[in-house]
Every structure is written in C-alpha cells, then in structure tokens.
Amino acid sequence: MSWIERIKSNITPTRKASIPEGVWTKCDSCGQVLYRAELERNLEVCPKCDHHMRMSARNRLHSLLDEGSLVELGSELEPKDVLKFRDSKKYKDRLASAQKETGEKDALVVMKGTLYAMPVVAAAFEFSFMGGSMGSVVGARFVRAVEQALEDNCPLICFSASGGARMQEALMSLMQMAKTSAALAKMQERGLPYISVLTDPTMGGVSASFAMLGDLNIAEPKALIGFAGPRVIEQTVREKLPPGFQRSEFLIEKGAIDMIVRRPEMRLKLASILAKLMNLPAPVAVSEAPHEGVVVPPAPDQEPEA
C-alpha cells in the first residue's frame, strides 16, 4: 500500500461558520466584538466600555416617548435642489443616495407623543443623512416642532447630531440658524421649556443656533461639541489643543453645558426635569419586565462551546 492510500479518510477540512451580515458589530472605542441585538437593547451603548455609539433618529425617539403615543410631524416636507448645486456630485443625486441609504427624506425627524404620560414634542437628527446637515427642510421641521409645542402648550426636546449647515443649500441653509432661533424665542415668551440634548457630534451652524439655546443643555458622555473641528482650530492657532478639547467633559468644566447624562438614564432624567419645570408630579420609574435571555451566537473569532 502506497503512502497516498494510507491517508486517513475521516479528516475533513475546517468549515468557516456562515455569519449573516449585520449580526455582529465592533465598538469604535474599545474594539470589542458585540452582538448587534444585545447592543440595540442597550441603546447603542457598549456594555464593555460604555462608549455611546451613534443612534438613528427613529430609534432615539422610539426609546424616548411612550409606546403607542408617537405621531410624526412634517413628514410631507421634502428637500428641493433649487440652486441646481453641483460639487463632485449633483446635490439631487446626493439627496437620492442619502434617502435610499437611510429611508428618511431629510436629516431631522419630529414626533409628538407622551413622556411618562406628559405631552411633549421631540426632534432628533439622523446623522447618517448627509452628516445630519441642516438645510431648509431641517429648519422647517424644527419650526413645525416649535409650533406644535406652542399649540399643545408642552415642552420641546431636541437631540442634535450634525456637522452643521448644508453647503449645497448655501445661504438658504444659513438662514435656518436665524429662523430656528426666532422660533425658540416664542417658546421663551410663552414660558415653555426647551431642552437641547447634544450628542456626538454637534458642530457648525447647528451648535451655533438652536442646539445651544436650550433652557437646559444636556450632553451625552464624550460627545464632540463645537463650531469648527479640532483639526481646523489647530491649523488656525498653530498650537496643540488640550486632551479632550470640545468633548462634553471639557465643556462642562468650562460651564458651556449644564449636565452630562448617560443614554440609559436620559429618559427618566428628562421626564423628571420637565415635570419640575411644568409643575407636574414627578414621574415614577417603572421597572420593566425582565427580557428573555438573548442567545448570543459565538463571535466570529470565537469557537462554539462544547
């Protein structure tokens, strides 16, 4: 018998496990491989290092408002390429691509509903839509949110995540800074609370307008907040910036924001603050029914347990 015939027939090559796309993701901060379903249940906060990942506008609003109370506002408003703007790509093509990728018509989603049974209007930025940039539709939807809050005599909450004004709309995008700020002046005249929640990142024209005009400005941990980015500032002043510059922890030390709140604690914290400001009874934290255990499949670099 030759040596070829003596090869053991029961030896089979190792098969790589087939892992569907989107089941696993990696933490941007600590690099830990995380099970997507478990991460979503944890509101996109890494359970290993507490890094707050970016969250979609709809998921944020659904996690904030009481189930079954949400009504979307301003969904009929759509962006138009009035200037026929073109850089390396036509603006209308950028819009079509962003709409297909995110399922949103523009970068701001507005809903009214209840928060611990208290009527509120809430808005949230979709950063995946052209970097959460502010154009005419974002400004119009924000004003619609203010008008609804005035009509319902209730508070307004806005979660910002934006790179600033949308350059493809030129002066029309810059006009939204004044437009939104003027609308908020009406909230102040009526004595209705406006709470601004700054998430990572909140920059440019958004940070220079309604994002910093809250009766309370609350930030998530380690959120980048400012007007120009750190690299631009370093190139301008020709100096090395201090560690953590423009992060929420740096800003609270300088008195630029009022508090930092972790995302899992945000809902109850907002409800408690608004109840005080509206002279309503404090919300009672209801313990949720325990979730069924999530069956976590082995990570791509792990072997199944015997």
From Swiss-Prot:
A zinc finger (C4-type) spans 27-49. Its cofactor is Zn(2+). Zn(2+) binds at C27, C30, C46, C49. Pathway: Lipid metabolism; malonyl-CoA biosynthesis; malonyl-CoA from acetyl-CoA: step 1/1. InterPro entries: AcCoA_carboxyl_beta, Acetyl_CoA_COase_Trfase_b_su, ClpP/crotonase-like_dom_sf, COA_CT_N, Znf-ACC. The keyword NADP does not apply. Its main location: cytoplasm. GO terms for molecular function: acetyl-CoA carboxylase activity; ATP binding; carboxyl- or carbamoyltransferase activity; zinc ion binding. Signal peptide: none annotated. One of its GO terms (cellular component) is acetate CoA-transferase complex. Binds 1 zinc ion per subunit. Transmembrane segments: none annotated. It is found in: Cytoplasm. The keyword Secreted does not apply. Pfam families: Carboxyl_trans, Zn_ribbon_ACC. Keywords: ATP-binding, Cytoplasm, Fatty acid biosynthesis, Fatty acid metabolism, Lipid biosynthesis, Lipid metabolism, Metal-binding, Nucleotide-binding, Transferase, Zinc, Zinc-finger. Component of the acetyl coenzyme A carboxylase (ACC) complex. Biotin carboxylase (BC) catalyzes the carboxylation of biotin on its carrier protein (BCCP) and then the CO(2) group is transferred by the transcarboxylase to acetyl-CoA to form malonyl-CoA. Acetyl-CoA carboxylase is a heterohexamer composed of biotin carboxyl carrier protein (AccB), biotin carboxylase (AccC) and two subunits each of ACCase subunit alpha (AccA) and ACCase subunit beta (AccD). This is Acetyl-coenzyme A carboxylase carboxyl transferase subunit beta. It comes from Klebsiella pneumoniae subsp. pneumoniae (strain ATCC 700721 / MGH 78578).
